[in-house]
Structures are given as structure tokens and as C-alpha cells.
């Protein structure tokens, strides 16, 4: 069992903070009662929860010292999981005007360290150790979703600071927690998200933040509550192609933490969750203009990515220079030359 009382005592948590107590209790109860975690899975889940809560505490402490925080304009890349968001995100990352939180920054963010300095290299090394153990738990994950310590990663690794992240459902069978995620007040997660970016900006303020997480899909109102000037790029791909892929990925991840994998249950709950997210998105996006919210087709991204980049920049009135275009073209060429493992399921 994951001992809630011991975690509370070890971290000196204040569970009178209802923004923390509800997700904490729902998550741990779901892991204990439903997940059927292996011994190693319990250790991993407990470690992650404690790390996420430590970072949450540090965020609260540091944020108190920031006067009138304001975050640079963010671009959110959204869409169903496995719909091409990573390729689109990585293309946009070639623009030096864009900054995205790096994996190591979300794993070992505090205290802030000097860019390219010795302490940053030490943090990257610590994050590489996390990835080493991740590879031991989930050997095939890099073939399906490669992660590097010094590369941008998804916002689900920021939302964990609020204990409101679909990451936990990917890790383990947590149906009660997934139901909570579908119906909870996600402003709690975006409050942590905003605080985290505000802190990162103290060291390096970008022209624009570039952010990605499929679970942003049904949270446009909550995002705009903290980022009123946000822009959204929504990539559309047939769910018949995307949903089976994320179900397969979920099953692969869970094998590292449990020996009891119910593929039918994963499929049913995955469809229900993303159907609800999509319905929320359909109503919320009606409030936004085409200059704030742009839908793009997966086929266009694959067939002619550079032309799509030009369309995106023109739509949002962003300047696209030759240097950035060349970087994007180079990224595409490099990707086409690299041997990729096909996701079979």
C-alpha cells in the first residue's frame, strides 16, 4: 500500500489546502484499491508522487516572491494523443522565438540554475538517471515516444505538480482517478502551470511559450483564465488511427508497473475520456476567433509541413524568417533519414 499518512508526514503537507487534499486522496486511493501495482510499481508511484509534491511546495515558495507575474504569450499545440502533435510541436520548436520547458526543467527545476552552466549539466545528468530507470521499467517506450533530458516535453509533466495529470492513468489502472480528472476543476492544474512558467521566466523570458499536451483539448476556458492571449493550434486526425495507438502505448507503459493489463478496459476508458474532452472542446472553441484558434489537418502536416508552417505563421501574424524556415527544413530532412521503429499493435 502507498501510505498516505507517511507521505503527508515526510513532506509536512498541509491537507487543509483543499486544492491538494482532493486530488491527493483520490489518486492514492485509486492506486491502492484499483491499480494492482507490482512491488516495483508501488515504489515508482510513491517516488513520483513525492517528487511532484516537493516541486509543488518549491513552486509555492518561490512564486510568493514574484511581483506582478505576467507570462509571455503561449501557443498551445492540442489534439488527440498520437495525432501528430509531437511532430508539429518539434517543427515549431525550431523557431528561436519559442521556448518550451525541457524535460530536465520539469524533473529537477529548483533552485534555478545558470543556463549552460555546470549546475545545469548536473541537473541534466540527474534527469538522465530518471530516464535510465524509465527504460528499465518500460523498455519499448523510446520507440513509441522518445524522451531526452535536454529536449522539450509535454505539459502533463507540469500538471503533475497539482496531481491532476493523465500521466497517472497511463501508468496504472486508476478508473476512479480518471473520472475525477474528467470532472474536476482543472484551474487548479493551470494555476500551478502558470506559476511554474512565471518562475522559469525569471531567468529567460521568451517571446512566446510553446506548449503541448493532448489533455489541454478540453480545457480552453481554464487555459484562457490564466493566459488570455493564448493561441491554439488544433491538429485533426481520424480517431480510428489515434485511439488504438494511445491504448497500445498505455498498455506498454503499464507493463512496467503491473502484471494485470486489461486491454478492453483501457480501450473503453480511453474512448470515454477523450470523447468527453472533445465535447468540451467543441463548445469552448466557439468563443474564439480564427486568429486565436486554428485547426490543421494531419494529412497537410505530413504531405507539406513547410507550407503548413507558413499558413500557421500567417494566420497568427507571426514573423517567419528564412533562418527558421531553414531550421524547420533541416529538422524534416533529418527525421526522414533517421530509422524509425514502426508502432505495431
PLM features: residue spans?
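PAPS-dependent sulfation machinery
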Residues: 107-209
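PAPS-dependent sulfotransferase catalytic core
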Residues: 244-276, 325-345
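Post-Walker A helix-loop "phosphate-sensing" segment adjacent to the P-loop in P-loop NTPases
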Residues: 94-104
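Charged, amphipathic alpha-helical linker segments immediately N-terminal to NTP-binding catalytic cores
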Residues: 13-56
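Phosphate-binding beta-loop-alpha motif at adenosine-nucleotide cofactor sites
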Residues: 207-214, 230, 268, 288-311, ...
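Glycine-rich phosphate-binding P-loop
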Residues: 77-94
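Long amphipathic N-terminal alpha/beta scaffold segment
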Residues: 40-80
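Conserved phosphate-donor/acceptor-positioning beta-strand/loop module used by diverse small-molecule
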Residues: 212, 223-248
Amino acid at each position: 500500500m502507498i501510505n498516505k499518512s507517511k507521505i503527508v508526514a515526510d513532506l509536512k503537507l498541509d491537507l487543509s489546502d483543499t486544492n491538494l487534499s482532493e486530488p491527493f486522496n483520490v489518486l492514492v486511493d485509486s492506486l491502492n484499491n484499483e491499480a494492482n501495482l507490482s512491488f516495483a510499481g508501488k515504489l515508482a508511484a510513491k517516488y513520483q508522487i513525492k517528487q511532484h509534491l516537493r516541486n509543488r511546495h518549491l513552486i509555492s515558495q518561490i512564486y510568493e516572491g514574484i511581483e506582478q507575474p505576467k507570462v509571455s504569450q503561449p501557443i498551445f499545440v492540442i489534439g488527440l494523443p498520437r495525432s501528430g502533435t509531437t511532430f508539429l510541436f518539434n517543427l515549431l520548436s525550431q523557431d528561436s522565438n519559442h521556448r518550451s520547458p525541457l524535460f530536465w526543467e520539469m524533473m529537477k527545476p529548483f533552485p534555478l540554475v545558470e543556463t549552460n552552466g555546470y549546475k545545469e549539466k548536473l541537473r541534466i545528468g540527474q534527469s538522465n538517471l530518471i530516464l535510465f530507470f524509465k527504460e528499465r521499467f518500460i523498455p519499448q517506450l523510446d520507440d513509441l515516444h522518445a524522451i531526452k533530458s535536454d529536449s522539450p516535453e509535454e505539459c502533463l509533466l507540469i500538471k503533475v505538480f497539482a496531481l491532476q495529470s493523465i500521466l497517472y492513468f497511463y501508468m496504472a489502472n486508476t478508473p476512479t482517478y480518471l473520472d475525477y480528472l474528467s470532472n474536476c476543476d482543472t484551474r487548479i492544474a493551470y494555476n500551478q502551470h502558470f506559476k511554474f512558467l512565471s518562475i522559469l521566466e525569471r531567468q529567460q523570458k521568451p517571446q512566446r511559450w510553446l506548449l503541448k499536451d493532448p489533455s489541454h483539448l478540453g480545457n480552453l476556458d481554464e487555459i484562457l483564465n490564466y493566459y488570455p492571449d493564448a493561441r491554439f493550434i488544433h491538429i485533426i486526425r481520424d480517431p480510428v488511427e489515434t485511439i488504438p495507438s494511445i491504448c497500445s502505448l498505455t498498455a506498454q507503459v503499464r507493463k512496467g508497473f503491473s502484471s494485470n493489463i486489461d486491454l478492453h478496459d483501457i480501450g473503453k476508458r480511453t474512448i470515454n475520456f477523450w470523447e468527453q474532452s472533445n465535447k468540451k472542446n467543441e463548445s469552448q472553441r466557439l468563443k474564439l476567433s480564427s486568429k486565436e484558434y486554428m485547426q490543421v489537418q494531419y494529412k497537410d502536416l505530413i504531405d507539406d509541413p513547410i507550407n503548413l508552417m507558413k499558413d500557421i505563421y500567417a494566420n497568427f501574424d507571426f514573423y517567419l524568417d528564412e533562418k527558421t524556415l531553414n531550421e524547420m527544413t533541416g529538422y524534416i530532412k533529418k527525421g526522414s533519414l533517421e530509422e524509425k521503429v514502426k508502432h505495431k499493435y
